[in-house]
């Protein structure tokens, strides 16, 4: 894995982690992803930023251009010029903050002469009841490093090497209060503004296409429930046995991933006893559905036909051999009868 792949992989893991932390249906999120490299040989600028609303990329910025650039049609237009002015100013400020933090972390690691990467993810979620949750995390060289705790205004170190930076940043209470104000006030306000701009696009709801497939490998029978082409990505999938929930520990689930066309996909698999497939049902809940959708595995016509043909051939083969055996027995009986008559006649 190359140097650039490591921060990209780190961001992918962070996105999944944040999304997996209990996001309820119909919630919305605003995320900013920052990354940078101390040397150009990593293929990254000193600072690069990407902004997402509900996991839809809408803005990009880098240290060289120092300008916010649109990545979505719904934020284009002269009417939104004020938005881009504010975004550019905010990202310039984060550009400066990121570089200062980068040098601080490198100095605390005695890495000033080496090439390293820094990654940051920050943002907020607004739930259906208008409650909010903020997050602000740092990763260094592709590993979790520091996380801001807005409730206590301190930093949580993910590794021992981060303790020096943690103690240094916790002295600056002004910055901690500014961070909390952004996560709890500014970020939710900006998210609501962006949701208004993206009305009709961001609030669309495409229900999932759900199907259950059957797989047999190494004497293990597995049912796989697939949810395809849905939007937004908030979805709940569970297995039921005789209409009762199955323990989640028994199921294997896949993270919700983009399909490449603006929709999402996911699946959940469950190993079941052979012959009991019809006792299991996949239940799916999604904002695009008026009520939970259920699906079961239905044997395909081709499988039924093949089974019938094989069974028919087997029956025919059995009947054929029984017929041959019957004829052989008849011939033997006839031969024995003829021999008996011959002997009796000779005795007379």
Swiss-Prot record:
The answer to whether UniProt assigns keyword Nuclease to this entry is no
Primary localisation category: membrane
The alphabetical list of record keywords is: Cell membrane, Disulfide bond, Glycoprotein, Ion transport, Iron, Iron transport, Membrane, Signal, Transmembrane, Transmembrane helix, Transport
Q: Does the keyword Transport apply?
A: yes
Annotated signal sequence is 1-22
List the source organism.
Answer: Diceros bicornis
Q: Where is this region: Alpha-3?
A: 206-297
Where does this one sit in the cell?
Cell membrane
Coding gene?
HFE
Sequence segments annotated as region (Connecting peptide): 298-306
Q: Describe the family membership recorded for this protein in Swiss-Prot or TrEMBL.
A: Belongs to the MHC class I family.
Annotated segments matching region Alpha-1: 23-114
The cross-references to PANTHER family, in alphabetical order and at most eight, read: HEREDITARY HEMOCHROMATOSIS PROTEIN, MHC CLASS I-RELATED
Provide the membrane topology annotation: Single-pass type I membrane protein
Give the protein's recorded name.
Hereditary hemochromatosis protein homolog
């Amino acid at each position: 894995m190359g140097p650039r792949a490591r921060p990209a992989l780190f961001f992918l893991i962070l996105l999944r982690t944040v999304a997996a932390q209990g996001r309820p249906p119909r919630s919305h999120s605003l995320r900013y992803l920052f990354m940078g490299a101390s040397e150009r040989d990593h293929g990254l600028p000193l600072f690069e930023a990407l902004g997402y609303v509900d996991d839809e990329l809408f803005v990009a910025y880098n240290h060289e251009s120092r300008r916010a650039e649109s990545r979505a049609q719904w934020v284009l237009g002269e009417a939104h010029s004020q938005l881009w002015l504010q975004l550019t100013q905010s990202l310039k400020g984060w550009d400066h903050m990121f570089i200062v933090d980068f040098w601080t972390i490198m100095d605390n690691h005695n890495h000033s002469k080496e090439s390293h990467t820094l990654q940051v993810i920050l943002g907020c979620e607004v739930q259906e009841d208008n409650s909010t949750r903020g997050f602000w995390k740092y990763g260094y060289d592709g590993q979790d490093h520091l996380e801001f705790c807005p409730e206590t205004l301190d930093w949580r170190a993910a590794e021992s090497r981060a303790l020096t930076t943690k103690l240094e940043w916790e002295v600056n209470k002004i910055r901690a209060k500014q961070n909390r104000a952004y996560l709890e006030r500014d970020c939710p306000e900006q998210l609501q503004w962006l949701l208004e701009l993206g009305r009709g696009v961001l609030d669309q709801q495409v229900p999932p296409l759900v199907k259950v497939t059957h797989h047999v490998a190494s004497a293990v029978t597995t049912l796989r429930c697939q949810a395809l082409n849905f939007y937004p990505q908030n979805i709940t999938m569970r297995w039921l046995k005789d209409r009762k929930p199955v323990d989640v520990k028994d199921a294997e689930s896949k993270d919700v991933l983009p399909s490449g066309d603006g929709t999402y996909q996911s699946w959940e698999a469950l190993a079941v006893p052979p012959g009991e497939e019809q006792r299991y049902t996949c239940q799916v809940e999604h904002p695009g559905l008026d009520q939970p959708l259920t699906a079961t595995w239905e044997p395909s016509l081709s499988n039924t036909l093949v089974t019938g043909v094989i069974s028919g051939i087997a029956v025919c083969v059995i009947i054929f051999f029984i017929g041959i055996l019957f004829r052989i027995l008849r011939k033997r009986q006839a031969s024995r009868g003829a021999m008996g008559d011959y002997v009796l006649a000779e005795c007379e």
